[in-house]
Amino acid sequence: MSQLCPCGSAVEYSLCCHPYVSGEKVAPDPEHLMRSRYCAFVMKDADYLIKTWHPSCGAAALRAELIAGFAHTEWLGLTVFEHCWQDVDNIGFVSFVARFTEGGKTGAIIERSRFLKENGQWYYIDGTRPQFGRNDPCPCGSGKKFKKCCGQ
């Protein structure tokens, strides 16, 4: 039985993010890396998350924290609403909303992630959290106001 990819692509997982998470392939661009990292959170794969963090971030030190977070967090969906990169600059950005429940409460991470390419491989380096007014349109594209959607 085929399983749709948790990244929201509407493609079978084995044909979408699995080749990246399993190490068969390297993500070709920041958007694919972002989507595969989301899948790693869903699948509780700390090794892939650490491997795809930029080496300067010292992600291995976060292993215990990541694993502890897996026990309390259920990921509900990912919406990528903006992505841009240039291989010439070796830098890229992906803006997304990741919805989750933790401790019985629903939440959302809204982030503009920054990625760096080194030696032919993209890495997550950091992200910023844009600020939205309660009456602004939600960045997830639902058409609702932020306060009635991801801002709850």
Swiss-Prot record:
Annotated SUPFAM superfamilies: NTF2-like, Sec-C motif
Protein family per UniProt: Belongs to the UPF0225 family.
HAMAP family in the cross-refs: UPF0225
This protein's name: UPF0225 protein YchJ
Gene: ychJ
